[in-house]
């Protein structure tokens, strides 16, 4: 089982914590991580694109000029796609791009993401994270104590309003509850700052 240092909010090492091998100690599967990120990014797409086809554009149904005798190419409608202002053929329509990967694959992906953070030594485990009031200054101080000076994902056992409000104005820092942890967030942040209670909650679900 991988062991990592356990810190307090002052950045002091107060012990060690053993992480579950089945969650934090597997060989990261890069292909599964790729598939999970693509799935999440696809679900984030708006899908509100739309073009008008020849039935929807403005213009009458009258034939622009007679079939023969003008010397011009024959035309049946000013709404044809080759006309300026004509309808689009096979244009995009509003749709949802979201899809789901199998549950086993999604679980393997999040385990791979967490294990990669342990392998790269980019995980910081806190005994607890609590603030008496929402103070951005206090959160910056805690992160400085922990030597976290890059993009960081903070994971708590449940969403703490004071922690969330204190971190939301810090560039590159995001706070999520343990039940909302996902592959894209873990991989797109350089450091994973997670509380001991959140580790237990994640292990309970994924182990």
From Swiss-Prot:
This is Large ribosomal subunit protein uL4. Part of the 50S ribosomal subunit. One of the primary rRNA binding proteins, this protein initially binds near the 5'-end of the 23S rRNA. It is important during the early stages of 50S assembly. It makes multiple contacts with different domains of the 23S rRNA in the assembled 50S subunit and ribosome. One of its GO terms (molecular function) is rRNA binding. Keywords: Ribonucleoprotein, Ribosomal protein, RNA-binding, rRNA-binding. GO terms for cellular component: ribonucleoprotein complex; ribosome. Residues 44-85 are annotated as: Disordered. SUPFAM superfamilies: Ribosomal protein L4 (SSF52166). GO terms for biological process: translation. HAMAP family: Ribosomal_uL4_B. It holds the Pfam family Ribosomal_L4. Gene3D superfamilies: 3.40.1370.10. Belongs to the universal ribosomal protein uL4 family.
């Amino acid at each position: 089982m991988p062991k990592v240092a356990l810190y307090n909010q002052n950045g002091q090492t107060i012990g060690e914590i053993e992480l579950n091998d089945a969650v934090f100690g597997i060989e990261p599967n890069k292909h599964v991580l790729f598939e999970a990120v693509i799935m999440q990014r696809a679900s984030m797409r708006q899908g509100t694109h739309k073009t008008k086809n020849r039935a929807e554009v403005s213009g009458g149904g009258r034939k622009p000029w007679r079939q023969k005798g003008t010397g011009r190419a024959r035309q049946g409608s000013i709404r044809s796609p080759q006309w300026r202002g004509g309808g689009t053929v096979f244009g995009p329509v509003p749709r949802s791009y979201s899809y789901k990967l199998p549950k086993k694959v999604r679980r393997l992906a999040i385990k791979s993401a967490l294990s990669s953070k342990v392998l790269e030594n980019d995980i910081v485990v806190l005994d607890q994270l609590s603030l008496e009031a929402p103070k951005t200054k206090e959160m910056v101080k805690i992160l400085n104590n922990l030597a976290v000076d890059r993009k960081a994902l903070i994971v708590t056992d449940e969403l703490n309003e004071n922690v969330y409000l204190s971190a939301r104005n810090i560039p590159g820092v995001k706070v999520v509850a343990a039940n909302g942890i996902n592959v894209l967030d873990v991989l797109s942040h350089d450091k994973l700052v997670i509380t001991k209670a959140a580790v237990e909650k994640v292990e309970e679900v994924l182990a």
